[in-house]
């Protein structure tokens, strides 16, 4: 149960979410400001992407508390991200876990999350989510089916897992302004669990040749922008590992004619924020960290606050001067976040600092990691 001490929000969260932390069943976050008209006038669009949604047992318990004991409500948890997510033309999350049903929910090590997570993602403003992860087959084919069914009901698109071979063969394409954006997603492994029997297509596994082939197929089918989500890397490592760096170089070097096959790479899995880097002219986010997770313990068995730190990437794409050329990123930003495990809320750290919260050291640590591979020199800036 939620103890009295855990019902008391930390001061930094209270500063930001006094109105958003409503526990009523009909909680609706305030409507965010509309995107700047200038972006729409030029045909440009903004894309935001965030890290792992990883509901541990404590997160499930918190959502039940926020729902007043009747079901689960994850919307208050995500309310702090909504002012960044909802105004974007296209918003992508990473849904790390599969969903259970009828109260059969669990956290680590075999996750089965309440399907109400999908409703909260939609309410926050997410248009789609990558679903390929090391936990994709925690409950076999049934878990994949329940997850994608719930996302469909909520109106949230998905990429990376599939219920049928036909679904696996078709790229997820989303509209962002006047652009068609293909979203592809893959994971390095599934924690040693085999894919469902006779369903080798159920989870997208990282294979360089396959990723490039899928990106080219999506482009050939009419995608203006191709975004690839990769669940990769070494857990609890701030720096991208050698395999991440090598694969990023290879994927961003892939071209058809003079046009790169991939326009943006979004990384998850490490549990900690990792660097952003422009590689071969393409932005790569090695790792966005965990957007929602319980109190995290690292691979040394030690409570590690980095596991509740993350970023939202925000990229503005502008259309080419001539048809068939590349949509270019004209602005690249990152927004540092913290998940306040005591209050059960996502906190935008720069907004918290503006309101007087003493979280500058956490924000600065995230900033230093994000910029550690020279991204500032290529124009990456910190946003709110």
Residue ranges with predicted function:
Residues 2, 22-384:
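Acidic, metal/ion-coordinating pockets
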